[in-house]
Amino acid sequence: MYNRKVMAVPKICAYAVITVCILGIIIGSFFDYNINVALANKTDIGAFFATYGSYFSYCLYPAAGMCIYKGLVKKGNSYRMMARCIMVITYFMAVYYSNNYNGSKVRELFGYTAGESSPFLSIISWGFWVILYAWVPFVCYRIFDDSDPDKLIMTGAAILVAGIVSDNVNLWLKQVASRPRYKYLITLDDPMSEFRNWWQMVPNLAGANDNFKSWPSGNMTIASMMFSLPLLSDVLKNRSEKKNIVCFVIASCFVIIYGYNRIHMTNHFLSDVCFGTLITYFIFLSVSAAFIKTTE
């Protein structure tokens, strides 16, 4: 008899994520603004988490790259160059995304001011991210099991494809909705005059204006990548169902904290957070089901 699983964990885990997100969307549809009034309050620790919290999610890119690398190398030397190329690309992706989303804070940390400071300081800020991700491929190389190279390759490919698709779908939906952010609304004399629920969409109003890119939450797309952690746990040398469940619990806690912080820091409403999580989770479910065997 087969034990049906999704993303290396029992289906009940997927049902739990989907149920919580739907409940959040329903509650947010009625009380989005009131929830933000009650919870939104910028703090230093919230700002720190907003800057560096995505680091853990982006670690998944070089980890996925190492999955593919180790699987291809196991298949033979003829794949070694391809493996190295993919590993470098995935490492670069983590560094690029981190620098793109949070680089301004790091450059500020190093005292860089565009047009005034030495360009060398900007290079150092890139090096900061390069160093932060350096441990990932080395550790993953040691702990991943290459006895089934096809599973390794498909696991890494699923995470990469799902991550890239999620990011682009999210960017497209932000333009479709063009929903004003709470942090923008509270700068107005009458915040409710421009408040819109998630279904009250005004396509392409946002343009390049980030103040109108509240729905769905892009940061929750990043955070929800952590739900693929059990997929990586499932290719460990000493893997077990218990470890997969532990990874799922860790991912869930991370996503909840991240989601709360997005509201707390005035960036999103509850429905934005839940939609960002749900959309990303569905994409990862679909891609992993297409790439990886879901029965064992």
Task: Label each PLM-derived region with a short phrase.
Residues 11-20, 83-87, 125-129, 150, ...:
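Alpha-helical transmembrane segments of integral membrane proteins
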Residues 24, 158-162, 166, 170, ...:
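Alpha-helical transmembrane segments in multi-pass membrane proteins
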Residues 2-18, 196-296:
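Membrane-embedded catalytic cores of phosphoryl/pyrophosphoryl-handling enzymes
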Residues 56-70, 126-140, 224-228, 277-294:
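Hydrophobic cores of alpha-helical transmembrane segments in multi-pass inner/ER membrane proteins
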Residues 27, 32, 36, 40, ...:
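Membrane-water interface at transmembrane helix exits
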Residues 34, 97-118, 140-246:
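Membrane-interface loops
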